[in-house]
Amino acid sequence: MKNLKLFLASCLAIACFSIQSANAQKGGVMLYGSFNYHETEAGHQLSAAPLGVGYFFNDNMNVGLNYGFNTSKNKALDFTDHFHEVGPFYSNTWPLGKHFNLIGQVEAHYIWGNEHVVNAANVMADGSYNGYLLRAYPLVGISLGKGWALKAKVAELSYKKKHSKDASIANDHEIITGINGSTVGLGISKNLFIKG
């Protein structure tokens, strides 16, 4: 985990020193993401929901790739569950004045991971899975200046299909609609323009 943090920090530092920020979006690159960490006596959870990089084809249309993960450690039972997602995204922005934007984003992700479950014999078992996740959601963006923005995800419509690789994990699907704790979030983005 320490090496991953060092790698991500190095990539961000290199990007910040080799490209300059600009207010114009067309031809620009957007970096965004949200890191979350939560710790209790029972364990801890680390996630990125998600980290992305996108290219502006015009002032309002952004296409790119994002990656998200969630790692949950249970201290009492001594296990860790992992979830990963990666895939393309498309977003469109509608200005609502000088400092506010309404953003719509859609994503199609490949997912994989491992989890621990209690099986029919009441025994803890672990297994791995893969599948896909389709998601659409609105965001409200607040321009902070010099290419920085604070973005709030306010709802979600998504479909997740999970295919088990092990008998201990059931094939499953999940539909998420509306507003709840898993569909609301804050993140930050930085728009950059590559020197020509």
Identify what each model region corresponds to.
Residues 51-137, 142-148, 182-196:
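Gram-negative (and chloroplast) outer-membrane scaffold detector with strong preference
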